[in-house]
Regions:
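Extracytosolic ligand-binding ectodomains
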Residues: 4-5, 11, 17-394
């Protein structure tokens, strides 16, 4: 990994990005790259909205280094190859200073070589499966030790150790479940079933019958996008609610809860680092601003908050560097702390992930999430799970 960092950093001397869009103008360009159409639009559009709110706040406060931010937006269309094409356009044609975007690990992995080739900088706002660290990506979401592992520990202790693993068929669910299976061996638990479905899949009847037949204690859900709508609705039609078989989800937050319906989701569990109900002074301001901008019927959520703070942390790193150049900003971001709605977060200089507090929540009847467990403070990111004996060899 260190060799990769060194090789890519050397590329910065040959291909310096960011400053070329801002030296001779009164604005600096950034790119927003999210799925505004397709199966992932339900989740990614609100993240885009939060990033635009952050841009508005920064511009109203005078901009960054005397320049206003100009947004160039592209639609990844829920397709990894489209994400890669749009990333190349933003970097090589639009010459943006940084890009904020992606959700699925498939889209992130599709754009990763593009950012490394053009020495751009992606600020990635979503929890993921770990096992990665690129000098050209700032990871604003949780690594597995800040979401998945604590959630499985909680379920094993509080609910039961017979777990059914259900996920979309792509990188994050498969890698997360590989981690979970190793963890359950250490916990003395059992995987009673493991199923992956294509993105956008909508028929879960046979899978739910299997879940019931296996006397499952808890379902570990790594479905993404609108498949969650079909799954939870069909779960309810089969007579399964949170009192019978609770579901622990890693990609459902407040926006999805209120789209799917609280009558179906109430009582089920989620694991994140932030909720709309998180009690900090900064969060009160953030929630108020977000609802003022987009309406009281909208909700904040973990990836939304991560997208919001990503833009603000980029701006702070630019100020610290005195430059928009990618390498200068990347170096300035190391060790940077920011008072976020979730609490103070800090960029780990070794892997460009955030220190984050872990919070497990239960969905309530009002469409919000009540925190029921949390770590005492921010947890150091460990994307390669180097501190877990049972994870060696994964």
């Amino acid at each position: 990994m260190k060799k990769l960092f060194s090789a890519l950093i050397m590329g910065a001397a040959i291909f310096t990005l960011g400053s070329c869009s801002s030296k001779n103008s009164n604005y600096v360009k950034i790119g927003l790259l999210h799925s505004l159409s397709g199966t992932m639009a339900i989740s990614e559009t609100p993240v885009r909205d939060a990033e635009l709110l952050a841009v508005k706040e920064i511009n109203e406060a005078g901009g960054v280094l005397g320049k206003k931010i100009k947004v160039i937006e592209e639609d990844g269309a829920s397709d990894p190859s489209t994400f890669a094409q749009k990333a190349q356009k933003l970097l090589s044609e639009d010459k943006v200073a940084s890009v904020f975007g992606c959700w699925t690990s498939s889209s992130r992995k599709a754009v990763k070589p593009v950012f490394e080739q053009y020495f751009g900088l992606l600020w990635y706002p979503v929890q993921y499966e770990g096992m990665e660290a690129s000098p050209n990506i700032m990871y604003m979401g949780a690594s597995p030790n800040q979401q998945v592992i604590p959630a499985v520990d909680y379920c094993a202790e509080k609910i039961g150790k017979r777990m059914y693993l259900l996920g979309s068929d792509y990188v994050f669910p498969r890698t997360a479940n590989r981690i979970i299976k190793a963890q359950l061996v250490q916990l003395g638990g059992e995987v009673v079933g493991e199923t992956y479905v294509p993105m956008g899949h909508s028929d879960f009847s046979a899978i739910i019958d299997e879940i019931k037949a296996e006397k499952t204690a808890v379902i570990i859900n790594t479905l993404n996008g609108d498949s969650n709508i079909a799954f939870f609705k069909q779960l309810g039609l089969k007579g399964i609610d949170s009192s019978k078989i609770p579901v622990m989800s890693f990609s459902i937050a407040e926006e999805e809860v209120n789209f799917i319906g609280t009558d179906i989701l109430k009582g089920h569990l989620v694991s994140w680092n932030y909720y709309e109900t998180t009690e900090t002074a900064m969060n009160e301001q953030f929630v108020s601003r977000y609802k003022t901008e987009y309406g009281n019927d909208r909700f904040t959520a973990d990836p939304i908050e991560a997208g919001y703070i990503a833009v603000h942390m980029w701006a702070e790193a630019c100020k610290k560097a005195g430059s928009f150049d990618v390498e200068a900003v990347r170096v300035a971001a190391k060790g940077l702390s920011y008072t976020a709605p979730e609490g103070t977060v800090t960029i780990d200089g070794n892997n460009q992930h955030l220190y984050k507090q872990v919070r497990i929540g239960r969905i309530n009847e009002n469409g919000l999430i009540d925190e029921i467990w949390a770590t005492p403070g921010a947890v150091k990111p460990d994307p390669y799970l180097s501190t877990y004996e049972w994870a060696r060899g994964l």
